[in-house]
Amino acid sequence: MRRYKKYIALILTFIILVTNFTACKAADNTRGTGAENPLEAKDIPDNEAMLFVEELKIGWNLGNTFDAIDNNSLTDELEYERAWNGSYTTEEMIDAVKEAGFNTVRIPVSWHNHLTDDDYTVSEAWMDRVNEVVDWCINRDLYVILNIHHDNSTEYLYPSEEYAEQSIKYITAIWTQLAERYKEYDEHLIFEAMNEPRLVGHENEWWINPDNEDCIEAIACINRYNQVFVDLIRNSGGNNANRYLMCPGYAASSDGALNEGFKLPTDTVEHRLIVSVHAYTPYNFALEAAGTDTWSMENQSDINNMVGFMDKLYDKFITKGIPVVIGEFGARNKYNNNEARTEFAAYYVEAARARGMTCCWWDNNAFIGKGENFGLLNRVSCKWQYPEIVEAMMTHVE
Protein backbone atom coordinates (compact mmCIF):
# COMPACT_ATOMS: atom_id res chain seq x y z
CA MET A 1 0.00 0.00 0.00
CA ARG A 2 2.80 2.40 0.85
CA ARG A 3 4.50 1.52 -2.44
CA TYR A 4 1.28 2.38 -4.33
CA LYS A 5 0.95 5.63 -2.43
CA LYS A 6 4.53 6.45 -3.34
CA TYR A 7 3.83 5.79 -7.01
CA ILE A 8 0.64 7.83 -6.87
CA ALA A 9 2.52 10.70 -5.22
CA LEU A 10 5.17 10.60 -7.94
CA ILE A 11 2.51 10.61 -10.65
CA LEU A 12 0.67 13.54 -9.07
CA THR A 13 3.92 15.47 -8.73
CA PHE A 14 4.66 14.86 -12.42
CA ILE A 15 1.18 16.04 -13.43
CA ILE A 16 1.54 19.22 -11.37
CA LEU A 17 4.94 19.97 -12.90
CA VAL A 18 3.66 19.43 -16.43
CA THR A 19 0.58 21.54 -15.75
CA ASN A 20 2.63 24.40 -14.32
CA PHE A 21 5.09 24.24 -17.20
CA THR A 22 2.26 24.31 -19.75
CA ALA A 23 0.59 27.22 -17.97
CA CYS A 24 3.84 29.16 -17.93
CA LYS A 25 4.37 28.54 -21.64
CA ALA A 26 0.82 29.66 -22.36
CA ALA A 27 1.37 32.82 -20.36
CA ASP A 28 4.60 33.46 -22.25
CA ASN A 29 2.85 32.99 -25.59
CA THR A 30 0.03 35.36 -24.73
CA ARG A 31 2.38 37.83 -23.08
CA GLY A 32 0.14 38.56 -20.13
CA THR A 33 -3.16 38.72 -22.01
CA GLY A 34 -5.01 35.63 -20.87
CA ALA A 35 -6.11 32.71 -23.02
CA GLU A 36 -6.31 34.51 -26.37
CA ASN A 37 -3.10 35.83 -27.89
CA PRO A 38 -3.74 39.36 -29.25
CA LEU A 39 -0.51 39.18 -31.24
CA GLU A 40 -1.51 36.11 -33.22
CA ALA A 41 -2.12 37.02 -36.87
CA LYS A 42 -5.81 37.18 -37.74
CA ASP A 43 -7.37 36.24 -41.05
CA ILE A 44 -6.71 39.07 -43.49
CA PRO A 45 -8.52 39.30 -46.84
CA ASP A 46 -6.06 39.30 -49.72
CA ASN A 47 -7.69 41.85 -52.01
CA GLU A 48 -5.57 44.47 -53.75
CA ALA A 49 -6.17 47.20 -51.17
CA MET A 50 -5.26 45.02 -48.21
CA LEU A 51 -2.05 43.93 -49.92
CA PHE A 52 -1.26 47.56 -50.72
CA VAL A 53 -1.61 48.64 -47.09
CA GLU A 54 0.57 45.72 -46.05
CA GLU A 55 3.25 47.05 -48.42
CA LEU A 56 3.15 50.45 -46.68
CA LYS A 57 4.68 48.53 -43.75
CA ILE A 58 5.32 51.33 -41.26
CA GLY A 59 5.18 55.10 -41.56
CA TRP A 60 6.76 58.24 -40.18
CA ASN A 61 5.09 61.65 -39.95
CA LEU A 62 6.95 64.78 -41.05
CA GLY A 63 5.05 66.54 -38.29
CA ASN A 64 5.09 70.19 -37.20
CA THR A 65 6.53 71.13 -40.57
CA PHE A 66 4.28 71.99 -43.51
CA ASP A 67 1.30 71.86 -41.16
CA ALA A 68 2.46 74.90 -39.13
CA ILE A 69 0.00 77.80 -38.86
CA ASP A 70 -0.74 80.95 -36.85
CA ASN A 71 2.53 82.85 -37.09
CA ASN A 72 1.95 86.35 -38.39
CA SER A 73 5.51 87.47 -37.68
CA LEU A 74 6.97 85.58 -40.63
CA THR A 75 8.10 87.68 -43.58
CA ASP A 76 8.43 84.75 -45.98
CA GLU A 77 5.69 82.12 -46.17
CA LEU A 78 8.27 79.39 -46.72
CA GLU A 79 9.51 80.03 -43.18
CA TYR A 80 6.38 78.26 -41.95
CA GLU A 81 8.16 75.00 -42.69
CA ARG A 82 10.48 75.52 -39.74
CA ALA A 83 8.24 77.76 -37.60
CA TRP A 84 7.21 74.94 -35.26
CA ASN A 85 10.18 72.60 -35.40
CA GLY A 86 13.18 74.84 -36.10
CA SER A 87 14.45 73.03 -39.19
CA TYR A 88 13.90 72.93 -42.91
CA THR A 89 13.41 69.48 -44.37
CA THR A 90 16.49 68.06 -46.09
CA GLU A 91 17.22 65.07 -48.28
CA GLU A 92 19.47 63.79 -45.49
CA MET A 93 16.42 63.57 -43.21
CA ILE A 94 14.53 61.52 -45.77
CA ASP A 95 17.59 59.29 -46.23
CA ALA A 96 17.64 58.65 -42.48
CA VAL A 97 13.95 57.74 -42.49
CA LYS A 98 14.43 55.36 -45.40
CA GLU A 99 17.55 53.75 -43.96
CA ALA A 100 15.83 53.14 -40.62
CA GLY A 101 13.28 50.95 -42.36
CA PHE A 102 10.25 53.22 -42.72
CA ASN A 103 8.40 52.65 -45.96
CA THR A 104 5.85 55.47 -45.79
CA VAL A 105 6.09 59.19 -45.05
CA ARG A 106 2.96 61.12 -44.13
CA ILE A 107 3.34 64.78 -45.04
CA PRO A 108 0.71 66.88 -43.22
CA VAL A 109 0.14 70.21 -44.98
CA SER A 110 -1.90 73.25 -44.00
CA TRP A 111 -2.96 75.31 -47.01
CA HIS A 112 -5.16 78.15 -45.79
CA ASN A 113 -2.23 80.37 -44.76
CA HIS A 114 -0.74 80.13 -48.26
CA LEU A 115 -3.64 81.36 -50.36
CA THR A 116 -3.30 84.15 -52.91
CA ASP A 117 -6.94 85.00 -53.65
CA ASP A 118 -10.56 84.46 -52.66
CA ASP A 119 -10.74 81.41 -54.92
CA TYR A 120 -8.32 79.60 -52.59
CA THR A 121 -5.46 79.48 -55.05
CA VAL A 122 -2.37 78.18 -53.25
CA SER A 123 0.83 80.13 -53.80
CA GLU A 124 3.18 78.60 -56.34
CA ALA A 125 6.13 78.86 -53.95
CA TRP A 126 4.37 76.78 -51.29
CA MET A 127 3.12 74.25 -53.82
CA ASP A 128 6.61 73.87 -55.26
CA ARG A 129 8.26 73.39 -51.89
CA VAL A 130 5.80 70.72 -50.78
CA ASN A 131 6.21 69.06 -54.18
CA GLU A 132 9.98 69.03 -53.77
CA VAL A 133 9.78 67.06 -50.53
CA VAL A 134 7.15 64.71 -51.97
CA ASP A 135 9.57 63.97 -54.81
CA TRP A 136 12.48 63.37 -52.43
CA CYS A 137 10.42 60.65 -50.77
CA ILE A 138 9.07 59.02 -53.90
CA ASN A 139 12.49 59.06 -55.56
CA ARG A 140 13.62 56.89 -52.64
CA ASP A 141 10.78 54.46 -53.28
CA LEU A 142 8.86 55.65 -50.23
CA TYR A 143 5.09 55.93 -50.17
CA VAL A 144 3.71 59.39 -49.38
CA ILE A 145 0.43 60.38 -47.72
CA LEU A 146 -0.54 63.99 -48.56
CA ASN A 147 -3.46 65.74 -46.90
CA ILE A 148 -5.32 68.87 -45.83
CA HIS A 149 -4.22 69.33 -42.22
CA HIS A 150 -4.80 72.30 -39.86
CA ASP A 151 -7.50 73.92 -41.97
CA ASN A 152 -10.25 73.11 -39.49
CA SER A 153 -12.19 76.34 -38.94
CA THR A 154 -15.48 77.90 -39.95
CA GLU A 155 -13.60 79.92 -42.57
CA TYR A 156 -12.35 76.85 -44.40
CA LEU A 157 -13.40 73.37 -43.29
CA TYR A 158 -15.98 72.75 -40.60
CA PRO A 159 -18.43 69.82 -40.31
CA SER A 160 -21.77 71.51 -39.73
CA GLU A 161 -24.68 72.31 -42.03
CA GLU A 162 -24.17 76.02 -41.41
CA TYR A 163 -20.69 75.84 -42.93
CA ALA A 164 -21.12 72.90 -45.30
CA GLU A 165 -21.30 74.96 -48.49
CA GLN A 166 -18.21 76.91 -47.48
CA SER A 167 -16.35 73.71 -46.56
CA ILE A 168 -17.19 71.98 -49.83
CA LYS A 169 -15.97 75.03 -51.74
CA TYR A 170 -12.66 74.90 -49.87
CA ILE A 171 -12.19 71.13 -50.21
CA THR A 172 -12.98 71.37 -53.91
CA ALA A 173 -10.54 74.23 -54.50
CA ILE A 174 -7.59 72.67 -52.68
CA TRP A 175 -8.02 69.15 -54.00
CA THR A 176 -8.61 70.36 -57.56
CA GLN A 177 -5.17 71.97 -57.50
CA LEU A 178 -3.48 68.98 -55.90
CA ALA A 179 -5.21 66.50 -58.19
CA GLU A 180 -4.03 68.38 -61.27
CA ARG A 181 -0.46 68.72 -60.07
CA TYR A 182 -0.03 65.09 -59.08
CA LYS A 183 -2.30 63.28 -61.53
CA GLU A 184 0.57 61.50 -63.28
CA TYR A 185 2.16 60.25 -60.04
CA ASP A 186 1.83 56.53 -59.48
CA GLU A 187 0.41 54.70 -56.47
CA HIS A 188 3.33 55.76 -54.28
CA LEU A 189 1.30 58.93 -53.67
CA ILE A 190 -1.80 58.58 -51.49
CA PHE A 191 -4.31 61.38 -50.91
CA GLU A 192 -5.93 61.81 -47.48
CA ALA A 193 -9.11 63.89 -47.61
CA MET A 194 -8.89 65.73 -44.28
CA ASN A 195 -7.13 65.67 -40.94
CA GLU A 196 -9.25 65.13 -37.85
CA PRO A 197 -12.43 66.91 -39.07
CA ARG A 198 -14.30 67.99 -35.96
CA LEU A 199 -16.36 70.68 -34.26
CA VAL A 200 -13.52 72.95 -33.16
CA GLY A 201 -14.41 74.72 -29.91
CA HIS A 202 -17.39 72.47 -29.21
CA GLU A 203 -17.67 70.54 -25.94
CA ASN A 204 -17.46 67.39 -28.06
CA GLU A 205 -14.56 68.56 -30.19
CA TRP A 206 -12.43 65.52 -29.36
CA TRP A 207 -14.86 63.11 -27.70
CA ILE A 208 -17.73 62.18 -29.98
CA ASN A 209 -21.14 61.84 -28.37
CA PRO A 210 -23.28 59.60 -30.60
CA ASP A 211 -26.47 61.04 -29.06
CA ASN A 212 -25.54 64.71 -29.50
CA GLU A 213 -27.37 66.37 -32.40
CA ASP A 214 -24.35 68.47 -33.33
CA CYS A 215 -22.17 65.35 -33.50
CA ILE A 216 -24.75 63.49 -35.57
CA GLU A 217 -24.85 66.42 -37.99
CA ALA A 218 -21.05 66.60 -38.07
CA ILE A 219 -20.77 62.92 -38.96
CA ALA A 220 -23.19 63.39 -41.85
CA CYS A 221 -21.21 66.40 -43.09
CA ILE A 222 -17.93 64.48 -42.93
CA ASN A 223 -19.53 61.74 -45.02
CA ARG A 224 -20.48 64.38 -47.60
CA TYR A 225 -17.01 65.93 -47.60
CA ASN A 226 -15.38 62.54 -48.10
CA GLN A 227 -17.71 61.86 -51.02
CA VAL A 228 -16.93 65.23 -52.63
CA PHE A 229 -13.23 64.45 -52.26
CA VAL A 230 -13.48 60.99 -53.83
CA ASP A 231 -15.65 62.16 -56.73
CA LEU A 232 -13.33 65.06 -57.47
CA ILE A 233 -10.17 62.95 -57.47
CA ARG A 234 -11.71 60.22 -59.62
CA ASN A 235 -12.82 62.76 -62.25
CA SER A 236 -9.51 64.65 -62.40
CA GLY A 237 -7.73 62.45 -64.91
CA GLY A 238 -4.48 60.53 -65.09
CA ASN A 239 -3.62 58.06 -62.36
CA ASN A 240 -6.12 59.70 -60.03
CA ALA A 241 -8.75 57.41 -61.51
CA ASN A 242 -7.25 54.56 -59.48
CA ARG A 243 -5.33 56.33 -56.74
CA TYR A 244 -5.61 55.05 -53.17
CA LEU A 245 -7.58 57.52 -51.07
CA MET A 246 -7.86 57.81 -47.29
CA CYS A 247 -11.05 59.00 -45.59
CA PRO A 248 -11.44 59.79 -41.86
CA GLY A 249 -14.41 59.72 -39.57
CA TYR A 250 -15.11 62.30 -36.87
CA ALA A 251 -11.78 63.68 -35.52
CA ALA A 252 -10.14 60.72 -37.31
CA SER A 253 -10.74 58.84 -34.07
CA SER A 254 -11.46 55.14 -33.85
CA ASP A 255 -14.80 56.04 -32.26
CA GLY A 256 -15.55 58.25 -35.26
CA ALA A 257 -14.80 55.44 -37.70
CA LEU A 258 -16.73 52.92 -35.61
CA ASN A 259 -19.79 55.14 -35.25
CA GLU A 260 -22.74 53.64 -37.09
CA GLY A 261 -23.32 56.96 -38.87
CA PHE A 262 -19.91 56.92 -40.56
CA LYS A 263 -20.10 55.73 -44.15
CA LEU A 264 -17.29 55.31 -46.63
CA PRO A 265 -17.93 57.08 -49.94
CA THR A 266 -19.11 55.23 -52.99
CA ASP A 267 -16.35 54.82 -55.53
CA THR A 268 -16.01 54.13 -59.24
CA VAL A 269 -13.27 51.55 -58.64
CA GLU A 270 -13.09 48.67 -56.20
CA HIS A 271 -10.69 48.36 -53.30
CA ARG A 272 -9.12 51.82 -53.44
CA LEU A 273 -10.48 53.44 -50.26
CA ILE A 274 -8.69 53.32 -46.91
CA VAL A 275 -10.14 54.25 -43.52
CA SER A 276 -7.94 56.87 -41.81
CA VAL A 277 -7.66 56.60 -38.03
CA HIS A 278 -5.54 58.34 -35.39
CA ALA A 279 -5.09 56.53 -32.09
CA TYR A 280 -2.87 57.65 -29.23
CA THR A 281 -4.05 54.74 -27.13
CA PRO A 282 -4.12 54.18 -24.21
CA TYR A 283 -4.66 57.92 -23.89
CA ASN A 284 -3.45 58.25 -20.30
CA PHE A 285 -0.05 56.87 -21.32
CA ALA A 286 0.36 57.96 -24.92
CA LEU A 287 -0.94 61.53 -24.92
CA GLU A 288 -2.38 62.81 -21.64
CA ALA A 289 0.07 65.15 -19.91
CA ALA A 290 -1.14 64.29 -16.42
CA GLY A 291 -1.47 60.60 -17.14
CA THR A 292 0.82 57.71 -16.36
CA ASP A 293 4.36 57.27 -17.64
CA THR A 294 4.22 53.47 -17.41
CA TRP A 295 3.01 50.87 -19.88
CA SER A 296 3.64 47.15 -19.81
CA MET A 297 2.49 44.14 -21.77
CA GLU A 298 2.26 42.39 -18.40
CA ASN A 299 -0.57 44.75 -17.44
CA GLN A 300 -3.90 43.37 -18.66
CA SER A 301 -5.63 46.76 -18.78
CA ASP A 302 -2.78 48.26 -20.82
CA ILE A 303 -3.20 45.49 -23.37
CA ASN A 304 -6.99 45.70 -23.41
CA ASN A 305 -7.02 49.44 -24.03
CA MET A 306 -4.76 49.02 -27.02
CA VAL A 307 -6.09 45.93 -28.75
CA GLY A 308 -9.70 46.73 -27.91
CA PHE A 309 -10.10 49.46 -30.51
CA MET A 310 -8.00 47.51 -33.01
CA ASP A 311 -10.28 44.49 -32.70
CA LYS A 312 -13.33 46.67 -33.32
CA LEU A 313 -11.74 48.20 -36.43
CA TYR A 314 -10.78 44.72 -37.57
CA ASP A 315 -14.34 43.44 -37.13
CA LYS A 316 -15.99 46.40 -38.89
CA PHE A 317 -13.56 46.99 -41.75
CA ILE A 318 -10.74 44.48 -42.20
CA THR A 319 -12.98 41.42 -42.24
CA LYS A 320 -14.91 43.07 -45.08
CA GLY A 321 -11.76 43.77 -47.07
CA ILE A 322 -11.62 47.48 -46.20
CA PRO A 323 -8.10 48.53 -45.17
CA VAL A 324 -7.24 50.77 -42.23
CA VAL A 325 -4.19 52.99 -41.79
CA ILE A 326 -3.45 54.40 -38.35
CA GLY A 327 -2.00 57.63 -39.71
CA GLU A 328 -0.95 58.94 -36.31
CA PHE A 329 0.13 57.08 -33.20
CA GLY A 330 2.91 57.39 -30.66
CA ALA A 331 3.70 58.00 -27.01
CA ARG A 332 5.01 61.30 -25.73
CA ASN A 333 8.20 61.33 -23.71
CA LYS A 334 7.37 61.59 -20.01
CA TYR A 335 10.45 61.98 -17.85
CA ASN A 336 12.55 59.79 -20.17
CA ASN A 337 10.26 56.78 -19.86
CA ASN A 338 11.89 55.28 -22.92
CA GLU A 339 11.75 51.68 -21.73
CA ALA A 340 7.97 51.88 -21.44
CA ARG A 341 7.67 53.72 -24.76
CA THR A 342 9.82 51.12 -26.49
CA GLU A 343 7.71 48.25 -25.15
CA PHE A 344 4.54 50.13 -26.09
CA ALA A 345 5.71 50.88 -29.64
CA ALA A 346 6.76 47.29 -30.31
CA TYR A 347 3.49 45.85 -29.03
CA TYR A 348 1.35 48.47 -30.80
CA VAL A 349 2.92 47.83 -34.21
CA GLU A 350 2.82 44.05 -33.80
CA ALA A 351 -0.83 44.09 -32.71
CA ALA A 352 -1.81 46.37 -35.60
CA ARG A 353 0.06 44.29 -38.17
CA ALA A 354 -1.60 41.15 -36.82
CA ARG A 355 -4.91 42.77 -37.79
CA GLY A 356 -3.76 43.95 -41.21
CA MET A 357 -3.23 47.61 -40.28
CA THR A 358 -0.28 49.90 -40.95
CA CYS A 359 0.82 52.57 -38.43
CA CYS A 360 2.59 55.92 -38.81
CA TRP A 361 4.47 57.36 -35.81
CA TRP A 362 3.78 61.05 -35.16
CA ASP A 363 7.22 62.74 -35.09
CA ASN A 364 6.98 66.46 -34.35
CA ASN A 365 10.72 67.00 -33.70
CA ALA A 366 9.91 67.89 -30.08
CA PHE A 367 12.27 66.57 -27.41
CA ILE A 368 12.49 68.95 -24.46
CA GLY A 369 10.12 70.60 -22.02
CA LYS A 370 6.76 69.30 -20.81
CA GLY A 371 4.90 69.46 -24.11
CA GLU A 372 3.92 66.79 -26.60
CA ASN A 373 7.39 65.37 -27.12
CA PHE A 374 6.93 62.76 -29.83
CA GLY A 375 10.24 63.41 -31.57
CA LEU A 376 12.34 60.47 -32.71
CA LEU A 377 14.58 61.91 -35.45
CA ASN A 378 16.92 64.77 -34.61
CA ARG A 379 16.48 66.82 -37.75
CA VAL A 380 19.76 68.68 -37.35
CA SER A 381 22.06 65.69 -36.94
CA CYS A 382 19.72 63.33 -38.86
CA LYS A 383 20.35 60.78 -36.10
CA TRP A 384 17.69 58.93 -34.18
CA GLN A 385 17.33 60.32 -30.66
CA TYR A 386 15.70 57.10 -29.46
CA PRO A 387 16.96 54.36 -31.80
CA GLU A 388 15.64 51.67 -29.47
CA ILE A 389 12.05 52.79 -30.18
CA VAL A 390 12.64 52.76 -33.93
CA GLU A 391 14.32 49.35 -33.80
CA ALA A 392 11.50 47.93 -31.68
CA MET A 393 8.92 48.98 -34.26
CA MET A 394 10.95 47.58 -37.14
CA THR A 395 11.10 44.17 -35.47
CA HIS A 396 7.43 43.62 -36.20
CA VAL A 397 7.03 45.19 -39.64
CA GLU A 398 7.60 42.21 -41.93
Where are these regions (language model features)?
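Bacterial N-terminal signal peptides that target proteins for export
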Residues: M1-I11
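Active-site region of glycoside hydrolase catalytic domains
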Residues: E165-Q300, D311-A331, A354-M357
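Aromatic-rich peripheral "rim/lid" segments of glycoside hydrolase catalytic domains that contact
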Residues: N336-E398
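N-terminal carbohydrate-binding accessory modules
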Residues: N29-T104, K316
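An active-site-proximal structural segment forming one wall of the substrate-binding cleft
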Residues: N85-T104, D119-I148, L157-A193, I222-R234
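Acidic/histidine-rich helix-loop elements
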Residues: G63-T89, D117-V122, Y163, N284-M306
